[in-house]
Amino acid sequence: MLTERQLLILQTIIDDFIGSAQPVGSRTLAKKDEITFSSATIRNEMADLEELGFIEKTHSSSGRVPSEKGYRFYVDHLLAPQNLPNAEIVQIKDLFAERIFEAEKIAQQSAQILSELTNYTAIVLGPKLSTNKLKNVQIVPLDRQTAVAIIVTDTGHVQSKTITVPESVDLSDLEKMVNILNEKLSGVPMEELHNKIFKEIVTVLRGYVHNYDSAIKMLDGTFQVPLSEKIYFGGKANMLSQPEFHDIQKVRSLLTMIDNEAEFYDILRHKQVGIQVKIGRENSSTAMEDCSLISATYSIGEEQLGTIAILGPTRMQYSRVISLLQLFTRQFTDGLKK
């Protein structure tokens, strides 16, 4: 159990190191307004904190830096919520204020904005389309041979594709098909659409559409859409600006891992609900042993739909990043409910 004095010194060391990236010595601490102890007392308390494993000495300086154990204690026990600047809150809310909420577009823009606001790498795992439910479908003729099929899901996902309209299918048939599809398929999970169409809808269409076989073939192509989650990155190269990553081998290893989207799928796909903070070697990848990953899930009710994460150095602005992620996930969840 740390004393009040040790807690204050530990928090001050970590706050100072996060801001400066420079090891913190007793002289630096003695100049802080909140530290009213003598230099000798500060040195003794720092020695005790080092012995307990919360801070450690670097080879190049007489100062101390936080250890992984120190960061973990800081995040779990010393972190205070940070109020975000009003301009940033407005910028984020404006992103989600669009009349038509497209989850994929918002996910992509969220990754970009988060990377700019933090100067870290932002990763957003979009909703898995297979669990989305069909809201409606439109088929808009462009000319006699082509049309655009627009599929909208309950989470705001909009999938459009150009399809070929067989000569034997006239425009009145298209209109009948769309009406039947919306009546029978609205609310059906995307992953069940194919079976639903070919086991139930075909029999209904047979009674209304003249050139039935051609129409069914066109429908089959219309609903062939990718169902897996999409992953979006913002600021992939931002880690290069962090002083911890001036080692070429370390940077190469990290950037190679960031480029491996499959690995991030595995890291983000099974996150628990809420905010999670993984520090250093708590991360599963050795390339991330000098990094922290803060992630937050967004959902509708009890259904978890995706994950937003920030990858940065262990010397991360934890309070600010957590506040940003909380705001983003609230806005994302509210947008999906529209």
From Swiss-Prot:
Record flagged with keyword Transmembrane helix: no
Residues forming coiled coils: none
- NCBIfam families (UniProt xref): hrcA (TIGR00331)
Top-down, what is the taxonomic lineage of the species of origin? Bacteria, Bacillati, Bacillota, Bacilli, Bacillales
Give the highest taxon in the source lineage. Answer: Bacteria
Q: Which Pfam families match?
A: HrcA
Alphabetized HAMAP family for the sequence: HrcA
Q: What does this protein do?
A: Negative regulator of class I heat shock genes (grpE-dnaK-dnaJ and groELS operons). Prevents heat-shock induction of these operons.
Gene3D superfamilies in the record: 3.30.450.40, Heat-inducible transcription repressor hrca homolog, domain 3 (3.30.390.60), Winged helix-like DNA-binding domain superfamily/Winged helix DNA-binding domain (1.10.10.10)
Listed GO biological process terms: negative regulation of DNA-templated transcription
Record-given protein name: Heat-inducible transcription repressor HrcA
GO MF term set: DNA binding
Could you tell me the keywords of this UniProt record?
Answer: Repressor, Stress response, Transcription, Transcription regulation
As for family, the record states: Belongs to the HrcA family.
